[in-house]
Amino acid sequence: TATGGSVATAHPGAQSIPTELRKNILACIMHTMEQTEDFCDSDFGIERLAEKAGTNSRYTSVVINNVFGKNFRSLLNEYRIKEAMRRLMDDDTYGKLTIKAISESVGYKSQANFITVFTRITGIKPSMYQKLSREEKEKKINA
Protein backbone atom coordinates (compact mmCIF):
# COMPACT_ATOMS: atom_id res chain seq x y z
CA THR A 1 0.00 0.00 0.00
CA ALA A 2 0.99 3.65 -0.28
CA THR A 3 1.36 3.82 3.50
CA GLY A 4 4.14 1.24 3.59
CA GLY A 5 2.14 -1.91 4.28
CA SER A 6 3.01 -5.09 2.44
CA VAL A 7 1.88 -5.38 -1.14
CA ALA A 8 1.06 -8.85 -2.40
CA THR A 9 1.91 -7.86 -5.96
CA ALA A 10 5.45 -6.68 -5.10
CA HIS A 11 6.67 -10.26 -5.56
CA PRO A 12 3.98 -11.94 -7.60
CA GLY A 13 3.26 -15.58 -6.97
CA ALA A 14 3.01 -18.21 -9.64
CA GLN A 15 -0.67 -17.31 -10.16
CA SER A 16 0.34 -14.04 -11.82
CA ILE A 17 2.32 -15.93 -14.48
CA PRO A 18 0.18 -17.41 -17.28
CA THR A 19 -0.17 -21.19 -16.86
CA GLU A 20 1.40 -22.04 -20.23
CA LEU A 21 4.39 -19.83 -19.51
CA ARG A 22 4.77 -21.39 -16.04
CA LYS A 23 4.79 -24.86 -17.60
CA ASN A 24 7.34 -23.80 -20.22
CA ILE A 25 9.62 -22.21 -17.62
CA LEU A 26 9.43 -25.34 -15.44
CA ALA A 27 10.13 -27.62 -18.42
CA CYS A 28 13.17 -25.55 -19.31
CA ILE A 29 14.43 -25.55 -15.71
CA MET A 30 14.05 -29.32 -15.52
CA HIS A 31 15.72 -29.88 -18.89
CA THR A 32 18.65 -27.61 -18.04
CA MET A 33 19.22 -29.07 -14.58
CA GLU A 34 18.59 -32.74 -15.47
CA GLN A 35 19.82 -33.08 -19.06
CA THR A 36 22.77 -30.68 -19.26
CA GLU A 37 25.77 -29.75 -17.16
CA ASP A 38 25.27 -26.01 -17.73
CA PHE A 39 24.90 -25.55 -13.97
CA CYS A 40 28.52 -26.70 -13.54
CA ASP A 41 29.68 -23.44 -15.11
CA SER A 42 30.86 -21.20 -12.26
CA ASP A 43 29.14 -18.22 -13.90
CA PHE A 44 25.79 -20.01 -14.26
CA GLY A 45 23.10 -17.90 -12.64
CA ILE A 46 19.38 -17.34 -12.66
CA GLU A 47 19.75 -14.84 -15.51
CA ARG A 48 21.19 -17.53 -17.79
CA LEU A 49 18.53 -20.03 -16.75
CA ALA A 50 15.82 -17.43 -17.44
CA GLU A 51 17.36 -16.66 -20.83
CA LYS A 52 17.24 -20.37 -21.73
CA ALA A 53 13.56 -20.38 -20.71
CA GLY A 54 12.88 -17.29 -22.82
CA THR A 55 11.71 -15.29 -19.82
CA ASN A 56 13.02 -13.01 -17.10
CA SER A 57 14.80 -13.91 -13.88
CA ARG A 58 11.87 -12.77 -11.72
CA TYR A 59 9.45 -15.24 -13.33
CA THR A 60 12.08 -17.97 -13.19
CA SER A 61 12.64 -17.27 -9.50
CA VAL A 62 8.89 -17.36 -8.77
CA VAL A 63 8.52 -20.74 -10.53
CA ILE A 64 11.50 -22.19 -8.63
CA ASN A 65 10.18 -20.92 -5.30
CA ASN A 66 6.68 -22.25 -5.95
CA VAL A 67 7.59 -25.63 -7.44
CA PHE A 68 10.67 -26.56 -5.42
CA GLY A 69 9.99 -24.58 -2.25
CA LYS A 70 13.48 -23.06 -2.31
CA ASN A 71 15.40 -20.27 -3.94
CA PHE A 72 17.56 -20.54 -7.05
CA ARG A 73 20.85 -20.67 -5.10
CA SER A 74 19.64 -23.62 -2.99
CA LEU A 75 18.43 -25.47 -6.09
CA LEU A 76 21.72 -24.79 -7.87
CA ASN A 77 23.73 -26.02 -4.88
CA GLU A 78 21.72 -29.24 -4.72
CA TYR A 79 22.34 -30.02 -8.38
CA ARG A 80 26.03 -29.14 -8.13
CA ILE A 81 26.49 -31.32 -5.04
CA LYS A 82 24.59 -34.20 -6.65
CA GLU A 83 26.97 -33.98 -9.62
CA ALA A 84 29.98 -33.71 -7.29
CA MET A 85 28.81 -36.88 -5.51
CA ARG A 86 28.61 -38.68 -8.84
CA ARG A 87 32.10 -37.50 -9.76
CA LEU A 88 33.54 -38.43 -6.37
CA MET A 89 32.20 -41.97 -6.89
CA ASP A 90 33.50 -42.22 -10.48
CA ASP A 91 37.12 -43.19 -9.89
CA ASP A 92 37.65 -44.22 -13.51
CA THR A 93 36.96 -40.73 -14.84
CA TYR A 94 37.58 -38.43 -11.88
CA GLY A 95 39.71 -40.54 -9.50
CA LYS A 96 42.88 -38.58 -10.12
CA LEU A 97 41.24 -35.21 -9.41
CA THR A 98 41.61 -33.47 -6.07
CA ILE A 99 38.58 -32.34 -4.07
CA LYS A 100 39.48 -28.80 -5.17
CA ALA A 101 39.47 -29.82 -8.85
CA ILE A 102 36.12 -31.59 -8.47
CA SER A 103 34.66 -28.57 -6.67
CA GLU A 104 35.79 -26.33 -9.53
CA SER A 105 34.47 -28.82 -12.11
CA VAL A 106 30.94 -28.46 -10.70
CA GLY A 107 31.04 -24.68 -10.56
CA TYR A 108 32.43 -23.69 -7.17
CA LYS A 109 35.05 -20.96 -7.17
CA SER A 110 35.93 -21.62 -3.52
CA GLN A 111 36.86 -25.06 -2.20
CA ALA A 112 35.93 -23.96 1.33
CA ASN A 113 32.43 -22.97 0.17
CA PHE A 114 32.09 -26.29 -1.69
CA ILE A 115 33.05 -28.28 1.41
CA THR A 116 30.61 -26.28 3.56
CA VAL A 117 27.71 -26.76 1.13
CA PHE A 118 28.57 -30.43 0.49
CA THR A 119 28.68 -31.16 4.23
CA ARG A 120 25.42 -29.29 4.87
CA ILE A 121 23.59 -31.22 2.12
CA THR A 122 25.08 -34.71 2.63
CA GLY A 123 26.04 -34.68 6.30
CA ILE A 124 29.67 -35.65 5.57
CA LYS A 125 32.72 -33.97 4.07
CA PRO A 126 33.54 -34.69 0.40
CA SER A 127 36.81 -36.45 1.32
CA MET A 128 34.93 -38.84 3.62
CA TYR A 129 32.25 -39.40 0.98
CA GLN A 130 34.95 -40.28 -1.56
CA LYS A 131 36.70 -42.60 0.93
CA LEU A 132 33.43 -44.39 1.78
CA SER A 133 32.58 -44.72 -1.93
CA ARG A 134 35.97 -46.27 -2.64
CA GLU A 135 35.63 -48.68 0.30
CA GLU A 136 32.16 -49.68 -0.92
CA LYS A 137 33.53 -50.28 -4.41
CA GLU A 138 36.36 -52.42 -2.97
CA LYS A 139 33.82 -54.53 -1.03
CA LYS A 140 31.88 -55.19 -4.25
CA ILE A 141 35.04 -56.11 -6.15
CA ASN A 142 36.24 -58.45 -3.39
CA ALA A 143 32.81 -60.00 -2.75
Would you name each region that the model predicts?
Residues 114:
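Binding-interface segments
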